[in-house]
């Protein structure tokens, strides 16, 4: 157990570095009064939404915790659920607080140099990445030992599955409400402001502009933070459950290996973060990529001694497990490249949509849907190769049943860079907000150019991290499916395989319902954006009509009215899709039993991953097709192609920022629900 101290050391170091970076960001110059006033409105709106969101989620979580205690008759599960929910909410709160304070400092820093603004923005994002991964690691570790991990290590992992369920529960509602908020505000601001009134983006005359900027934080910052928090927590717990079978070969090392690997990944991310700096004329994306490459190389290096020490035994060659970990790290790189290909305007798919816009909105939509469907192929091929490759390496290791553990190590490899990836993701809304503050405050053109460059790189990082999130979700849910099968075998005292026969009517029906649920959930999430956006559109139109002088700039819009309308709409609309996901797997498991629940989990994961890829990449491609036209291609701004591009972008908004990211959470939530309630499905 000599490597055990790395676990608390990695978590505590991450929190200390996050504290240092928070202090570093808050010490920066806050700029002129005009910037401070705008930033204060964004901060007030974002924190008010977060407080109301968490109050709503807390009430729902309390009800679920009581039901869990009554159904499972185990206080461990309910305590773990509440702990996971609280830790997930806390990490989101920390990230949001720093993001809404960093945006102003980035805008002010852009008056001096690009590097100053980049450093502040990335450090603001790094706080979220470090807080999320540290709280996930420390939460799982603390519960493992609190529930008897030192004396009964083969039982404790089964008692802490509620932590993953709690994290997933909060993540689903945080991602849903945040996604509904950000896109309802965005659609409302764009359709009335840009299309009807003909004013540019982030124009202070637009009554929905503050709500739009608030939405960037609650969707991309708090939502994605909760998403990756549950990925790391659920993956750790799933791998620990698989590790129970390895105790005869590795002792307790097989169970705690995921925690040590996670801590090493956090340390690699911390080092990589300090390599992010850029010259005035350098592309900010190059600086961010440098840090990512350093993080990935260090993760590969650190994984070697950990694998050698913890996964070696009589007749077992650790090098195969090390190879499986490298597969996971390489897969994360490949996912980034695939996402970039389908969502960047440097490549064919986006240019194809932009060209189709010349003949109107209909051909834009047709082309975007085609690109979205096409974009599912390569990710599925590489996920499949990664799972098969890692499984084969696990089998070659000499460990009986080592194939599944090989896939677990691959998942650990992919998630080893999670802290850095999440820092890149939160960097996106911070730079977006900074650009809005600069635009609304009337800063000089040079400052706007700097924030535009940062914002462009931020849009790229947001798209890339969605690709990473769905790839890690796919691997994590395969791991959790294996953990569910293991738990059922333990409950039934089965020594061999537990076959899932899709030819049985009840098993087929369980699978069928899962595919339907994914599409029904997506429908309700997209409709929720439309419903909430209608309220915003009506309010913006009302203000343009009833408040004279807004368009002339002599009267100030009522920003707070739009913020309040979107907040109430998002919290109301999140309930139905959320309940669909929580209730459906429970009904399937209780009525159709464990084998049908396994089929539900398997098909729900497959359908969820593919639909999420379609929604994320299709929406991202529509967004950048519009941006490509705005650069002066196919007629530029104001042309018929541009109008068609705006329509496509508006359709893609709820795809890529609401339904798509929520599906990442859905596939993990159905896994953790079935894990927690497996005993009731027997």
Swiss-Prot record:
One of its GO terms (cellular component) is plasma membrane. The record marks 462 as: Determinant of potassium independence. The keyword Translocase applies. The record marks 220, 227, 657, 668 as: Important for ion transport. Keywords: Calcium, Cell membrane, Hydrogen ion transport, Ion transport, Magnesium, Membrane, Metal-binding, Translocase, Transmembrane, Transmembrane helix, Transport. Disulfide bonds: none annotated. It comes from Moorella thermoacetica (strain ATCC 39073 / JCM 9320). It holds the Pfam family H_PPase. The chain crosses the membrane at residues 1-21, 56-76, 78-98, 130-150, 160-180, 237-257, 258-278, 291-311, 318-338, 353-373, 375-395, 404-424, 468-488, 506-526, 574-594, 595-615, 662-682. GO terms for molecular function: diphosphate hydrolysis-driven proton transmembrane transporter activity; inorganic diphosphate phosphatase activity; magnesium ion binding. It comes from the Bacteria. It is a multi-pass membrane protein. Mg(2+) 2 binds at residues 216, 432. Mg(2+) 1 binds at residues 186, 190. Ca(2+) binds at residues 623, 649, 653. Proton pump that utilizes the energy of pyrophosphate hydrolysis as the driving force for proton movement across the membrane. Generates a proton motive force. It is found in: Cell membrane. This is K(+)-insensitive pyrophosphate-energized proton pump 2. It is an enzyme of class 7 (translocase). Homodimer. It catalyses: diphosphate + H2O + H(+)(in) = 2 phosphate + 2 H(+)(out). Substrate binds at residues 183, 656. Belongs to the H(+)-translocating pyrophosphatase (TC 3.A.10) family. K(+)-insensitive subfamily. Its cofactor is Mg(2+). Its EC number is 7.1.3.1.
């Amino acid at each position: 157990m000599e490597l055990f101290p790395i676990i608390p050391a990695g978590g505590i170091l991450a929190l200390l570095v996050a504290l240092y970076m928070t202090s570093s960001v808050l010490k920066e110059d806050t700029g002129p009064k005009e910037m401070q006033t705008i930033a204060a409105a964004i901060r007030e709106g974002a924190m008010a939404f977060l407080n109301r969101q968490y109050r709503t989620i807390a009430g729902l979580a309390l009800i679920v915790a009581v039901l869990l205690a009554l159904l499972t008759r185990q206080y461990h599960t309910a305590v773990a659920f509440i702990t996971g929910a609280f830790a997930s909410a806390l990490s989101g709160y920390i990230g949001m607080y720093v993001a809404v304070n960093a945006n102003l400092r980035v805008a002010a820093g852009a008056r001096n140099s690009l590097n100053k603004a980049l450093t502040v923005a990335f450090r603001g994002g790094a706080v979220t990445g470090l807080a999320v991964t540290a709280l996930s690691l420390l939460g799982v570790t603390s519960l493992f030992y609190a529930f008897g991990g030192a004396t009964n290590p083969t039982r404790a992992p089964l008692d802490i599955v509620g932590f993953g369920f709690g994290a997933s529960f909060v993540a689903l509602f945080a991602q849903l409400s945040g996604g509904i908020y950000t896109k309802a505000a965005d659609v409302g601001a764009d359709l009335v402001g840009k299309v009807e009134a003909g004013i540019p983006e982030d124009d202070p005359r637009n009554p929905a502009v503050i709500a739009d900027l608030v939405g960037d934080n609650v969707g991309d910052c708090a939502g994605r933070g909760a998403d990756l928090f549950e990925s790391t927590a659920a993956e750790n717990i799933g791998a620990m459950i698989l590790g129970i079978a390895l105790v005869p070969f590795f002792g307790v090392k097989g169970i705690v290996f995921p925690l040590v690997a996670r801590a090493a990944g956090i340390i690699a991310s911390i080092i990589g973060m300090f390599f992010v700096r850029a010259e005035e004329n350098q592309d900010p994306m190059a600086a961010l990529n440098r840090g990512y490459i350093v993080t990935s190389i260090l993760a590969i290096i650190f994984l070697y001694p950990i694998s050698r020490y913890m996964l070696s035994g009589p007749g077992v060659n650790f090098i195969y497990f090390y190879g499986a970990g490298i597969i996971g790290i390489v897969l994360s790189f490949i996912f980034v490249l695939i996402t970039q290909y389908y969502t960047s305007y440097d490549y064919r798919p986006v240019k194809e949509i932009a060209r189709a816009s010349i003949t109107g909105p209909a051909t834009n939509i047709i082309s975007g849907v085609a690109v979205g469907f096409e974009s599912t192929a390569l990710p599925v091929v590489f996920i499949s190769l990664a799972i098969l490759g890692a499984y084969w390496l696990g089998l070659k290791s000499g460990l009986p049943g080592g194939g599944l553990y090989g896939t677990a190590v691959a998942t650990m490899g992919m998630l080893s860079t999670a802290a850095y990836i999440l820092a890149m993701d939160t960097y996106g809304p911070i730079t977006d907000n900074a650009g809005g503050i600069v635009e609304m405050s009337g800063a000089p053109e040079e400052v706007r150019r700097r924030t535009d460059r940062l914002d462009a790189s931020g849009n790229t990082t947001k798209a890339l991290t969605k690709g990473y999130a769905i790839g890690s979700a796919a691997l994590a849910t395969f791991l959790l499916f294996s953990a569910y099968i293991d738990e059922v075998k333990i409950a039934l005292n089965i020594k061999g395989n537990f076959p899932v026969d899709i030819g049985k009517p009840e098993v087929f029906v369980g699978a069928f319902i899962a595919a339907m649920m994914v599409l029904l959930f997506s429908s309700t999430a997209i409709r929720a954006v439309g419903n909430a956006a209608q309220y915003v559109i009506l309010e913006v139109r009302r203000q343009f009509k009833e408040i004279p002088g807004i368009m002339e700039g002599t009267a100030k819009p009522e920003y707070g009215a739009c913020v309040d309308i979107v907040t109430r709409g998002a919290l109301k609309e999140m309930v139905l899709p959320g309940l669909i996901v929580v209730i459906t797997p429970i009904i399937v498991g209780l009525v159709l039993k464990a084998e049908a629940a396994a089929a539900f989990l398997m098909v729900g994961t497959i359908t969820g991953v593919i639909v999420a890829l379609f929604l994320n990449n299709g929406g991202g491609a529509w967004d950048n097709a519009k941006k490509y036209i705005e650069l002066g291609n196919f007629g530029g701004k104001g042309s018929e192609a541009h109008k068609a591009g705006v329509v496509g972008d508006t359709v893609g908004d709820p795809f890529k920022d609401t339904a798509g990211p929520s599906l990442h959470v859905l596939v993990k939530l159905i896994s953790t629900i079935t894990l927690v309630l497996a005993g009731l499905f027997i």
